[in-house]
Regions:
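Short amphipathic C-terminal alpha-helix that caps PH/PH-like domains
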Residues: 120-131
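Strand-helix-loop interaction patch of compact alpha/beta domains
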Residues: 1-107, 111-118, 122, 239
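Charge-rich (especially acidic), low-complexity segments
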Residues: 1-4, 137-243
Length: 243
């Protein structure tokens, strides 16, 4: 990676970034579904792919993040942009459609704040925890009895496959960010390995749905109609295209 444009950076910042990158190479986070690539031309930028964990509405989805490191790193946190968007879906209370990532570790939310002992690895592990069951509980004021909780889960598990898997694998214009092209071989390998599991999940949903269902999540102004039969067809078409 080049540091040609970073002559104003301190030796501490450069040394720390190089050490963080070395650590994530030597101790990869792939067991957590986390993949990281540092920009080869700009030492102040990095890219991450987090694959949605099993047993969550995000299972198998491809979630992208772009990291911009400040000149005084690690004394200040990086700016992290969330880059998996499509159909104007708010995929998580902490991940905004405009790309904002709202967590205390990055000093963008209340709670335990950033300290210089944090690393690229701890940032990515923290982001991974957002892709959990019942993500709406991360929204202030929402409890397990809230009427939107299960509706939101249904929307996310549907749109996870529609947007974060199908549209991403098809590299749909306006959805798949070209800057993450380097992760596509990883995505394809994961998709081929898990395609039958996800197919069975969709088939089960389709068999138990008599007609399309529409859900409104007022706090995010989301109105989504779920049609598993249509999604099943689109997913089978994707398998034919990729295999």
């Amino acid at each position: 990676m080049s540091i040609e444009k970073t002559v104003t950076l301190s030796k501490e910042t450069i040394r720390r970034l190089l050490n963080d990158v070395k650590t994530i190479i030597n101790t990869p986070l792939t067991d957590h579904g986390i993949y990281y690539s540092h920009d080869e031309d700009d030492i102040m930028k990095g890219y991450a792919l987090i694959i949605g964990p099993t047993e969550t509405p995000y299972f198998g989805g491809f979630y992208f993040f772009e990291l911009h490191f400040p000149a005084d790193y690690p004394h200040s946190p990086p700016l992290v942009l969330y880059c998996t968007n499509g159909d104007n879906i708010r995929f998580n209370p902490n991940l905004y459609v405009n790309g904002k990532v709202c967590i205390s570790l990055l000093n963008t939310w209340r709670g335990e704040q950033w300290t210089s002992c944090q690393t690229i690895s701890t940032i990515l592990l923290n982001l991974c925890t957002l892709l959990c069951n019942n993500p709406l509980l991360n929204e202030p004021g929402i409890t397990s009895k809230h009427t939107d909780l299960q509706k939101y889960n249904k929307i996310i598990e549907f749109k996870n496959i529609d947007v974060a898997i199908i549209q991403m694998m098809k590299k749909k214009t306006g959805v798949f960010p070209e800057k993450f092209e380097g992760f596509y071989p990883i995505m394809k390998e994961y998709f081929l390995k898990n395609k039958e599991v996800i197919l069975s999940f969709i088939e089960n949903k389709e068999q138990n749905q008599e007609h399309s269902e529409c859900y409104i999540i007022n706090i995010y102004n989301m109105n989504v109609c779920i049609n598993w039969s249509r999604l099943l067809k689109n997913y089978k078409d994707l398998i034919k295209e990729i295999v």
